[in-house]
Amino acid sequence: MLLKNLTLLEGFKIKIIDFQKYLREYDQTSGLYPKELMQIGEKYHQKEYLSRDELYQLAHLNSTRSSYHVKKNPARRVEKVTEAAYQIYDDFCRLTLYTGLMGIGIPTASAILTALDPERHCVIDTRVWATLYNLNYFDREKENFKADDYLKIIKIVRKMAAETEFTAAEIGYALFAYDVVHREGNLHQH
């Protein structure tokens, strides 16, 4: 396991992994498809909102298990919420708006943000948190996320991206793959 320390502007060291290696590994995982995610993001940028079908497609990329709940939202509500979120720059507020829709949790909301701006955002889930936990960024594992959890993760990921040639989205995919490669036992401990 290759770990390296980087000194950041704030004067503390950040542990990173071999992102290039784990980005190559990502293609072999069950993670979402970045190209499809970016295509949905392009549509979102063009119209400044997502239709219910587009949001379902994005949610299905991220979580096939819970994406069907997206279809329970009134179509106009999805358009209004995604349009309002598009106009806001604050990450916490955007996440809160997205998660007000049925079928959208923080992991899927993070995928929406990533579709819009892969330089600044990454898709988060249990695996990304677990990798950061194993690198000693967090003191416990976690399976359910709130907007504040995303903000904690993205702060670390953006620092990693700033010190490398990778985008925040690529860092997230590499962190996901790292957990796939190194996890012993089940992902979800119930």
Mark where each language-model region is.
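Helix-hairpin-helix/helix-loop-helix acidic hairpins
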Residues: 60-104
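Short charge-dense sequence patches
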Residues: 5-9, 27-30, 45-47, 74-83, ...
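Sparse, context-dependent recognition of short Cys/His-centered cofactor- or disulfide-binding micro-motifs
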Residues: 4, 43, 89, 97, ...
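Short alpha-helix boundary/capping elements
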Residues: 62-67, 117-121, 179-183
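Short loop/turn hinge sites at secondary-structure boundaries
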Residues: 47, 87-88, 118
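C-terminal accessory module of base-excision DNA glycosylases/AP lyases that mediates lesion recognition
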Residues: 1-57, 122-190
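Generic alpha-helix detector with strongest preference for long hydrophobic helices that associate
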Residues: 39, 79, 93, 108-113, ...
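Catalytic DNA-binding helix-loop module of base-excision-repair DNA glycosylases/AP lyases
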Residues: 93-134
